[in-house]
């Protein structure tokens, strides 16, 4: 019908709806309703338009008008940006040119204004068509409302990028107003109705339920905890222990002294290690990984669900696992003194950290000990009680520490970059309310195990690359020159001399920059800026190496319980050599699996960040009005972001500054016009907590004059100076986007901090508490 409508309108130019219905033979009551639905859909897709007189015309593009296709990224203030595949720079879309597009939509745009690199302005575009909507479901609390009697009410969603209300059709069940609903979008905003229309899919819970806030975030991203019945049944059919038949054909390593090293609260112990000195002076390192693929067979219900999830998701108070706990905490957990099926990379490593010989094979092991990071760190620190308790493996642990140092030095020499930044762990009570924020600890034990996992991943990747077989790689491509240039400019603002251009700067030069700022207050901020200049690591069927690790070959082999690519690698280790057809099969399935796994990983990261921001804001609600010392983590036109020692970050907007401030883009500073008070990244300042909003995850601070203030008077204004207080209050562009940065203030808090009577200061003993909590959310750190 659409094609016939277009033909008539092309021929006639303009028609009324009645004339069109008559021409199409759609003037019966039933057919006319069908025609109206089709016309509404075509108008929404900008294929036709209704003129002011009510007639219909085709939406015709202007002659010679070039259109582009991209993804729309909405800002909560109404404007947005369109990213184009293969292009570094985004297109700016003003509020009046959004044309009802919403975040994630695939859109067609025309260029209104080209970019001006001299002025630093982005190209501007207008959205002329929405090719595909990305948002199909929304989660939020129902607000009963009689304003539109046709509907039950509207949804209050945490999604700040949805500016129009979402009205919900009256469902069969009676709503009380406390329900958190998952709804399906039936109609999107248009010229006819500036709101969404949705139908109830499910009742997620109620606003009074414990943990409903986190569940709402997860459900909104379609991250679901419950497994389908068929998956649960398959998991329950898996035995509690391997049989003698299961062990046939495997290398028997049950007599080796192997042990796990994990966080104190970890239950899915999926990796174990052994080490021994060889007669030739080299060390043998064995990395043994639970053979999940033996129980999760290709094409099974377990396998399909694992691929759909592709990764476990770790948020503040829970884990949404890739596989049922029956597997991850049961037969696939390498608990001490029980037989377990594993896949092992056994490597002979010389004094330079080079793998000179290796075996990758299916094995059976029996771990001797279940060690924690804190136990191993204590042993290495000389704790006599712990050394006596674990005397059988003290020598092994010391050899491991020695090997770790060798491997770390080897990676540094070849150019590997270190992106270590402070990471917070939010502690919650039984009601899900945050009670403290501590820093995660990374002692020798944590870094040592990560180092061994990296070595195993590299060895497995190189093995398959040299066999020239279809394989899945974890790749990290070279950064784009434009982003490296931004980092160089940023680093230069600290007085650092940078050698080499953005397109040719070496990893060693980037290492030198980071070494030069070690111990400085802005070191972590600079490390975060370097990380942001990098491309995102992803999975691929093509080997492009790993830039951050300076590795020619890399994959993920060490966590099949929580990452699907690792599960696939284990499957390939077992299946290759069985037949020629198996290589052809893997060649066909790997690209789709790589894309799915990369997308699911990004979704998991987004969920983790959103929950963390929400919980940090909820935590800081208790401290509104309090004053603290903080460190400036980044400076933008509209203000400065500052960070507390527990990683909580907030914005001091220019409207919360006491005078007019000039923004210097070249030096990344804000300077008071009258006082000369100047803010720089890494500088310590005094702040007051003004606002914390759990719903949006935003925290606002204000500036408090103190002895930390730096005054620079009489300095000539840069031609790049931005506007100060008030002038930037309203903005239609990127400058109002909240950005994050990381900094670590190594100074102690001032004793002048105001505290509410009887209230525990949230920064108390941050480091000490972090040491008690081991892996936490935890295995997420092994994701390079």
Predicted regions and their residues:
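Charge-lined substrate channels and their catalytic hotspots, especially those that engage the 3′ end
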Residues: 1-286, 293-339, 370, 377-378, ...
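Basic/aromatic-rich interaction segments and small domains that mediate binding to polyanionic partners
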Residues: 86-87, 100, 638-648
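Intrinsically disordered, low-complexity linker and terminal regions at domain boundaries
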Residues: 105, 125, 653-699, 711-718, ...
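A generic structural signal for residues embedded in beta-strands
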Residues: 109, 183, 635, 687-689
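Phosphate-interacting basic helix/loop segments used at nucleotide- and nucleic-acid interfaces
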Residues: 184, 253-259, 264-282, 400-414, ...
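Conserved catalytic alpha/beta cores of large enzymes that bind or transform nucleotide phosphates
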Residues: 312-412
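Append "with occasional cross-activation on large, charged helical scaffolds in nucleic-acid assemblies
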Residues: 360, 373-644, 658, 662
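Intrinsically disordered, Lys/Arg-rich low-complexity segments
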Residues: 714-784
């Amino acid at each position: 019908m659409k094609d016939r409508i277009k033909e008539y309108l092309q021929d006639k130019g303009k028609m009324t709806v009645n004339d069109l219905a008559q021409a199409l033979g759609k003037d019966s009551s039933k057919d006319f309703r069908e025609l109206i639905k089709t016309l509404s859909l075509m108008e929404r897709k900008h294929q036709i338009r209704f003129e002011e007189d009510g007639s219909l015309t085709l939406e015709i593009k202007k002659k010679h008008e070039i259109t582009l296709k991209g993804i729309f990224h909405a800002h909560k203030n109404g404007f947005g940006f369109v990213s184009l595949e293969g292009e570094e720079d985004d297109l700016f879309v003003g509020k009046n040119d959004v044309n009802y597009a919403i975040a994630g939509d695939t859109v067609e745009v025309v260029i209104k204004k080209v970019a001006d690199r001299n002025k630093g302005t982005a190209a501007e575009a207008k959205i002329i068509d929405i090719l595909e909507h990305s948002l199909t479901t929304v989660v939020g609390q129902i607000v009963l409302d009689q304003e539109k009697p046709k509907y039950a009410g509207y949804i209050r969603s945490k999604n700040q990028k949805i500016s129009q209300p979402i009205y919900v059709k009256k469902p069969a069940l009676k709503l009380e107003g406390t329900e958190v609903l998952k709804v399906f979008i039936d109609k999107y905003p248009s010229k006819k109705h500036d709101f969404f229309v949705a139908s109830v899919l499910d009742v997620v819970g109620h606003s009074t339920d414990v943990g409903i806030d986190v569940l709402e975030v997860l459900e909104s991203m379609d991250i679901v905890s419950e497994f389908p019945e068929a998956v649960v049944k398959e998991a329950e059919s898996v035995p509690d222990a391997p049989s003698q038949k299961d062990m046939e054909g495997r290398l028997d390593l049950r007599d080796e002294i192997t042990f796990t090293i994990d966080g104190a609260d970890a239950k899915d112990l999926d990796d174990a290690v052994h080490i021994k000195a060889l007669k030739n002076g080299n060390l043998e390192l064995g990395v043994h990984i639970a053979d999940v693929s033996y129980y999760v067979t290709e094409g099974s219900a377990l396998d399909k669900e694992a691929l759909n999830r592709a990764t476990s998701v770790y948020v503040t108070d829970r884990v949404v696992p890739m596989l049922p706990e029956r597997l991850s905490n049961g037969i696939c957990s390498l608990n001490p003194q029980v037989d377990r099926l594993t896949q092992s990379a056994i490597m002979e490593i010389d004094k330079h950290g080079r793998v000179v010989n290796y075996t990758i094979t299916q094995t059976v092991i029996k771990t001797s000990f279940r060690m924690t990071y804190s136990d191993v760190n204590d042993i290495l620190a000389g704790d006599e009680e712990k050394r006596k308790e674990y005397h059988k493996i003290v020598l092994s642990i010391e050899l491991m520490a020695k090997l770790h140092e060798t491997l770390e030095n080897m990676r540094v020499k070849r150019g590997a970059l270190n992106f270590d930044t402070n990471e917070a762990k939010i502690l919650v009570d039984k009601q899900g309310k945050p009670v403290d924020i501590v820093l995660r600890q990374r002692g020798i034990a944590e870094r040592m195990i990560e180092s061994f996992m990296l070595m195993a991943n590299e060895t497995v990747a190189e093995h398959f690359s040299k066999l020239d077989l279809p394989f899945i790689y974890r790749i990290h491509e070279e950064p784009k020159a434009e982003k490296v240039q931004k980092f160089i400019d940023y680093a230069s603002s600290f007085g650092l001399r940078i050698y080499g251009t953005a397109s040719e700067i070496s990893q060693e030069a980037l290492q030198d920059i980071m070494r030069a700022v070690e111990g400085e207050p802005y070191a972590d901020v600079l490390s975060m800026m370097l990380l942001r200049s990098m491309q995102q690591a992803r999975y691929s069927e093509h080997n492009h190496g790993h830039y951050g690790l300076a590795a020619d070959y890399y994959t993920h082999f060490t966590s099949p319980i929580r990452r699907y690519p690792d599960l696939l690698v284990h499957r390939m280790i077992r299946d290759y050599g069985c037949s020629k057809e198996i290589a052809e099969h893997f060649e066909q399935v790997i690209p789709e699996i790589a894309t799915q796994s990369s997308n699911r990983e990004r979704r998991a990261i987004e969920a983790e960040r959103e929950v963390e921001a929400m919980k940090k804001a909820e935590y800081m609600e208790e401290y509104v009005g309090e004053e603290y010392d903080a460190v400036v983590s980044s400076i933008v036109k509209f203000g400065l972001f500052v960070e507390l020692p527990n990683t909580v970050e907030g914005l001091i907007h220019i409207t919360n500054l006491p005078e007019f401030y000039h923004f210097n883009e070249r030096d990344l500073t804000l300077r008071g016009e009258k006082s000369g008070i100047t803010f720089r990244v890494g500088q310590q300042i005094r702040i007051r907590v003004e606002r914390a909003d759990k719903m949006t995850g935003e925290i606002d601070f204000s500036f408090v004059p103190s002895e930390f203030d730096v005054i620079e008077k009489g300095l000539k204004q840069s031609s790049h100076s931005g506007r100060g207080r008030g002038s930037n209050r309203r903005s239609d562009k990127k400058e109002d986007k909240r950005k994050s940065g990381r900094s670590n203030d190594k100074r102690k808090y001032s004793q002048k901090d105001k505290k509410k009577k009887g209230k525990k200061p949230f920064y108390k003993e941050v480091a000490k508490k972090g040491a008690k909590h081991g892996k936490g959310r935890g295995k997420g750190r092994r994701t390079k």
